[in-house]
């Protein structure tokens, strides 16, 4: 559950991601939550969602995140149907910058899709939702991600590294320009 919150003194808006501990344990998502928190906490890049703080109480874990008021690219495409080549180039340029940064930290994002690219108040595209991200120094064999965006290496279980993010980038770029999946 993500809700809008406001800093008491500065009145600046933030997104508050609340995750119930019971559901985290039931879904065996402890590692995913810890990874997301750790990865976002170390990220300092203008094209990656900023984390402002984390906390927990007896029942829930909270991430205080940068508020991205522009929605996601999926919503933008629902409104506009397609993006022209200039818009697509701009958003994909932001995404490539984000991926290059994430990959420089030996992290594979592994869930690149329209819904995980959100727009800030200035119209820049940012990478969000690091729940499936993983530090990859060699190959990993976990089957994960959204099926429509999965690279063949993931689907076939041959092992993959951060290069799978570029397959998903190609699918995303195609969807921006043609409002449909290439497959």
Task: Describe the residue ranges of each PLM region.
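Activation segment signature within eukaryotic-like protein kinase domains
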Residues: 91-92
């Amino acid at each position: 559950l993500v809700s809008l919150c406001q800093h008491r003194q500065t009145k600046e808006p933030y997104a508050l991601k609340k995750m119930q501990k019971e559901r985290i344990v039931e879904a065996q998502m402890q590692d995913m939550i810890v990874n997301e928190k750790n990865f976002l906490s170390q990220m300092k890049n203008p094209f990656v969602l900023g984390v402002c703080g984390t906390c927990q109480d007896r029942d829930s874990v909270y991430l205080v995140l940068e508020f991205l008021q522009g929605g996601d690219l999926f919503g933008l495409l629902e409104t506009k149907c397609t993006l022209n080549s200039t818009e697509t180039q701009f958003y994909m340029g932001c995404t490539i910058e984000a991926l290059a940064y994430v990959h420089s930290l030996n992290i594979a994002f592994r869930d690149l899709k329209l819904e995980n690219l959100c727009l800030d108040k200035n119209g820049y595209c940012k990478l969000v939702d690091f729940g499936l991200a993983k530090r990859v120094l060699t190959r990993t064999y976990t089957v994960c991600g959204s099926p429509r965006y999965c690279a063949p290496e993931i689907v076939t279980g041959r092992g993959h590294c951060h290069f799978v993010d570029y397959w998903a980038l190609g699918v995303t770029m195609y969807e921006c320009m043609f409002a449909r999946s290439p497959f």
